[in-house]
Structures are given as C-alpha cells and as structure tokens.
Amino acid sequence: MKSNIQLHYCYFLLSEAKKKASYIGYSVNPCRRLRQHNGEIKKGAKKTKSGVPWNLGICVGGFPDRVAALRFEWAWQHPNICKVTRDNIESWKIVKTKKTSENKRILNKRQWSIQQRVSILLCMTTLEPWKNMNLTVFVFKDELENTIKEVIEGIKKIKISPNFTSPNILNKDYLLMFLYFGEDSFYEKGIKFLRCDYETFKEFQKPSFDCDSDSNIEDNSNVFNPEEIISHEDSFSIKCFLCQKDIGIGRNYLEFPCCTEIKVHLSCIQLWGESNNHLETVIDELFPLKEFVAPLIPLNISCPCCFKDFEWEEAKKNYIKTKNVPTESLELGEDFPVLSNGEKENYSQEENSQNKVIEDGFLEMDIDNHRNRLSYAHETKQKRDILFSDDEFSEISQKCEFIDLTVDSD
C-alpha cells in the first residue's frame, strides 16, 4: 500500500572498487537509491559510475522534512564551506588550517578520507540545529562502528564531550517507545546510533509514495553506458530542485546565478525562503495553525545548494525565466496548416483565452499546494510518523543492537 508520508535520509556509501572512495547523498528510499548507484535500475549518479559496486555504510534518518535533510547532506559534503561546521571541524582537529599573510585561515581542500567523513558526521550531530532533531544513525559496517568508537576516544583527549544517547533497552516496550518518539521519561534527547544489518533495514523500510516496490522501476543494467540514447523529450526536461517535478512548458522558474544548474518553481522557492522560518514556528506550536498566514511574497530567498541569500525583488527582475518549447522540436519536419489572417486572429484570441485559464489554474494549484504543505506540517506535529508496525518492531528488536557510545566525563 502506498504511503503519503515520506521519510528523509542522508546516506553514506563505500566503494568496493576503490577502497578510499565514498559518496554522500539524500533519498527517501536509500535501498532503492543504492540500486540506482550500482546501475541495476535507472537514474544513478554520474559521480558513482567508477566506484561500482557500492555498499551502504551509514544512513541518517529522522529529519522533519526534505529541506532539513538536504541541508544536512550539503553540510556533510562541504564542511569547509558551511558556516555551521567550518569552525567546529577545526576545533575537533579533523582538518589542518593554514594562515596567510593577511591572517586568514584557509582549510586544506582535498579529498576527505572515510575517517574524516565519520568524524564530520559526529561533529555535526553535536551542533545546532541537528542535535535537537533526535536523529537516528544506522551503522551497517563493523569497520565504521569501530571508526566511530575510535573518533569518540580521540576527542576525549581534546576535552570535547558530546552528548550521544546510548540507551539500555530493557524490553520491547522500551524499544518501541524510544524508536517511535526518540524520548521518554527514562532517556534524554540526543542522537541515537543503531548497529543494523542492511537486509534488516531493507526489510523494514516502507516503500515511498511514488512506487509500491523496486519491481515497479524499469530495470536498466546498462544505465552507465555512455552510448545510451536519450529520448528527445527527456533531453529538454527541466526538474525543480526542491520538489523534483518537471517544470512545464510556459511555467516560470528561478535560476540562481551562483548555481546555474539549480532551477526551482516559484511556489517552491517561496516555501523555502521567507516562510521556512514561519513553518518551523508552526511546527514548534508557538501559535496555532489557524492564526498563521505565510507571506505570499517572500522578502528574501536563498539558493537551495549553496545557501547564498538574494533579495526577492532582485531575483524577480534578473533570475526568473520561462520554459519555452525547444526550437529543435519545430525542426522535426511536422506539417503545420497555413492560416489566413482572419483565422490567425481567431486562433490568437483562442490561445490567449486558453493561456488565461491555464494561468488561473496554476495560481489555484500553487495556493492549494501551499495550503496542503501547511496542513501537512501541522498534521506531522500532531501525529508522529510511525516507522514500523508492532510486529515489525518485535523482529527488529531481535536483529539490531544499540551501539554504546557513552563518553565518561573526566
């Protein structure tokens, strides 16, 4: 049965072909995404082509929404650029620094090792806003579990004591309560590290809303074949970076000058921008949902990739584009009827009338989408997302064990 509730994960892959290679990504279904990276099904990333086969090493779940997961993913990928992490990874001695003649610190830019990636993850889980999200870190490899413990032992020497939750699960009821809510009267809030087998994780993972199972996805073993023929329709498709839906012909979209490959719907960037803070306020129940009205026009927006800020008026004037019918489609040799002047005028009036109806329809769709997202945010707060059923928890409690990462204070 399809579920309308999406779970958001950041995953960490390890390559069998290249022992030092790793990859960080985001998905609502990491197991299906792993198959895509390995070329079993369509739409794998180009960067993972040379490292096939890949294995799932770490998976971080429990994010409140897609935006939070994407921001976590970007910070994990670019810790030397992210404002939240760049100073802290220095204090954790994860990376060395240099000083120029102008006394500016420059982080060494090189490929991050697997141990550094794990250290960065542990560092991020102690920082705002992630330390308050009650995230769960699923660890699938013994070597990664050992690496995590080594990092914990290492940071003791520099007098850093992160607060990792390592509960003592007494029985199934405590396990249910802890994984459902992340807290109860016995345990404090914190990041949970769970040692889990990949097959167990795959078995208990619910299918995402867009497919019942992996069997619904067309098999394409040659997905990484460079000679693969791309269809004419797909070659001109533009997808919104935030909602991952196609931008229709005639629709306006925003293209950021800092990241030209990032294109988003205007309605999506409106929710990402000024109203994002208001959504967090609604979720935190600082005031009821019925009293909340998000601004239809944001004052400021930020690039979803690098988080560079832009004023809405500036973006509206300079960066909004319209997706038009590609000129190549007019060169396919299609025969078009020759119209007289009177027929052209009637056709033009008819087309303008249709465009007006389409624009009104898009406006109503944007308003409905906005209202539905707000209702979903409120509904998610009122009713916690249940990852597994009682029967599934009974089995997972026997197959998984929590990793003890308790740091004794000196």
From Swiss-Prot:
Main location: nucleus
Biological process annotations from GO: DNA recombination; DNA repair
Annotated compartments: Nucleus
One Pfam family, short name: GIY-YIG
InterPro entries found in the cross-reference section: GIY-YIG_endonuc, GIY-YIG_endonuc_sf, Slx1, SLX1_endonuclease
EC number, as in UniProt: 3.1.-.-
Keyword Nuclease: yes
Keywords annotated in UniProt: DNA damage, DNA recombination, DNA repair, Endonuclease, Hydrolase, Nuclease, Nucleus
EC category: hydrolase
Domain of life: Eukaryota
Cellular component annotations (GO), alphabetically ordered: Slx1-Slx4 complex
Cofactor(s) demanded: a divalent metal cation
GIY-YIG domain span: 6-89
Residue ranges crossing the lipid bilayer per the database entry: none
A molecular-function term among this protein's GO annotations: 5'-flap endonuclease activity
Family: Belongs to the SLX1 family.
Function summary: Catalytic subunit of a heterodimeric structure-specific endonuclease that resolves DNA secondary structures generated during DNA repair and recombination. Has endonuclease activity towards branched DNA substrates, introducing single-strand cuts in duplex DNA close to junctions with ss-DNA.
Oligomer and partners: Forms a heterodimer with a member of the SLX4 family.
Protein name stated in the entry: Structure-specific endonuclease subunit SLX1 homolog
Organism this protein belongs to: Cryptosporidium parvum (strain Iowa II)
